[in-house]
Amino acid sequence: MSFDINWSELVSDESLNESIKEFLDNQFQSISLPSFIDNLSVSDFSLGNSPPEITIRHIGDPFDDFYEDEGDDDEKERKNVYMQQGVSEDTNSSDDDEDDEYDGDRSNDLSIITEDPNIHTFTSEADRSRLASPPRPPLTDLRRSRASSDPFSLIMGNNNLNYMHNYNMNYVGLGNLNATGTHTGTDTPTNILNQNPYATLKSNPSSYYKNKDPSKFSGSDTHKNGFRLTSKEPCSTRGENDIQLIAEVKYNGDLHLELTVNLLVNYPSPNFISLPIKLHVTDLVIHSIITIAYLKNSVFFSFLCDVNDINSDYFTSSTQNSTPEHMGATNTGGNFVDYVSGPINRERIDIIKKVKIESEIGEAEQNALRNVGKVERFLVEQLRNIIRDEFAWPSWVCFDLNEDDDDESDDQEEN
């Protein structure tokens, strides 16, 4: 079975590029800038003409998080507190029986996908890392929905990673786990699909419910081409046509992002000199596992984890975090500099593995400043953070396809 995606028709719609540009600009406007730059904005964006390579790895039912609403969350959180304070053994036994019955009903929902005959099993310690630090606050009110569980409690069973092989995975909040549960960054967790989405909840109930403050999910981005980005509550009931894809996406295309910012010289007085900088972000490299779910005329999208390319410089020990590949070369205006994510980020999903930046400082014919590496590294890291926080699990973005129906209803009411 195959799907044909008309990429040229998708990118020919300028409203889509404009919507993404406005979204990124709003995100950059919301971050705290260091003292040496100001007036940061996104001046241009283009998806480019090169489509990503998409390989479907699994087709099944959507994650339960896409169906949960705020009322259910409040009830579950109250139940979770009750469980943490101590519930009688009889009550716990009853709950376990109910969960076991549910697990049996879903035991055949997920198929086995084997890429390598060498099967490895690794123990997850997702809850330990998540409970150690508080969740990061949203960048803006445009924060999309967030799942209640750790990234793979929905697709891991019995606290083991099962049924997908031959992939180095960088799990959100987990890092790379070996058989003893330690973070090494080099061992290869090889499986991500499971048969028991509640295994982590049963063994560590406090890890399942996380921040679901509805005030964080306000806002909506409307597209002119018939859909809109929305932060509406997930569907509360399952439909017979609901479906979810787990896919591997590999992108190394000609996406272009243009940023403008002023570089400040604060000596001998604050803002003594202001130099305009134009940064062209190109050659974006992404290799990740994603989920795409269709629920009642809405499409949910989220990055689940990175795929670690064995032959890539992304996970070599010599690679430094967000540093130019050619450290000896002087970064002058108009030069291209590559930035790659290094081993320090192995504990989290990065999504952006590599990116190239061309800097223009002052007038194009003049070398106004010889070193803008600090500005470039700051912007690259912020771009990674924005995409990771907004699109990586446990966050997701929802494309609401009901806009045409809403417009028709409004027209009928006016007539």
From Swiss-Prot:
Residues 53-146 are annotated as: Disordered. GO terms for cellular component: endoplasmic reticulum membrane; ERMES complex. GO terms for molecular function: lipid binding. InterPro entries: Mdm12 (IPR027532), SMP_LBD (IPR031468). The SMP-LTD domain is a barrel-like domain that can bind various types of glycerophospholipids in its interior and mediate their transfer between two adjacent bilayers. Belongs to the MDM12 family. Component of the ERMES/MDM complex, which serves as a molecular tether to connect the endoplasmic reticulum (ER) and mitochondria. Components of this complex are involved in the control of mitochondrial shape and protein biogenesis, and function in nonvesicular lipid trafficking between the ER and mitochondria. MDM12 is required for the interaction of the ER-resident membrane protein MMM1 and the outer mitochondrial membrane-resident beta-barrel protein MDM10. This is Mitochondrial distribution and morphology protein 12. It comes from Debaryomyces hansenii (strain ATCC 36239 / CBS 767 / BCRC 21394 / JCM 1990 / NBRC 0083 / IGC 2968) (Yeast). The lineage of its organism: Eukaryota, Fungi, Dikarya, Ascomycota, Saccharomycotina. The gene is MDM12.
